């Protein structure tokens, strides 16, 4: 199946001034309304990582769950859930981070990873990189390492991919948008 970049980007809806004035939110829900596009996204990630040497897939709450869980299933890898504060029932590790909207906390079960594990982190989008950096810090606190940070969309003008790369975390995104791109 050929990956059609222009059709793919047309399925990501810009929502102006959401969730606050001045923000252009990239809504991926239309992408999931197209089984063909969803399959192309999943297949692209599966093909990229089918031979890669890593042990776990970490998914960010909540839109990272949509793609990362299917990729984990396809690659037969354990899934690690990184949740918003207060959503996990057992002992957790917590990490504060800044989003483009304000401060938040990311949590993971403290027994999710072991020393020597290697994690591919999935989110829907890289903006400031705050969520993925917080997840990387949690991964490292458990003695594991980050293989790569992955998203459907990169917003390079917000600097997240650069921040991740500066922290020696490679990134991979299927597409990118300029902030003013409609």
UniProtKB/Swiss-Prot annotation:
The keyword Cytoplasm applies. Gene3D superfamilies: 3.40.50.2020. InterPro entries: Ade_phspho_trans (IPR005764), Adenine_PRTase (IPR050120), PRibTrfase_dom (IPR000836), PRTase-like (IPR029057). It is an enzyme of class 2 (transferase). GO terms for cellular component: cytosol. Its EC number is 2.4.2.7. The keyword Transferase applies. CDD domains: PRTases_typeI (cd06223). One of its GO terms (biological process) is adenine salvage. It comes from the Bacteria. Keywords: Cytoplasm, Glycosyltransferase, Purine salvage, Transferase. Pathway: Purine metabolism; AMP biosynthesis via salvage pathway; AMP from adenine: step 1/1. Its main location: cytoplasm. It catalyses: AMP + diphosphate = 5-phospho-alpha-D-ribose 1-diphosphate + adenine. It is found in: Cytoplasm. One of its GO terms (molecular function) is adenine phosphoribosyltransferase activity. NCBIfam families: apt, PRK02304.1-3, PRK02304.1-5. Catalyzes a salvage reaction resulting in the formation of AMP, that is energically less costly than de novo synthesis. Homodimer. Belongs to the purine/pyrimidine phosphoribosyltransferase family. This is Adenine phosphoribosyltransferase. It comes from Pseudomonas savastanoi pv. phaseolicola (strain 1448A / Race 6) (Pseudomonas syringae pv. phaseolicola (strain 1448A / Race 6)). The gene is apt.
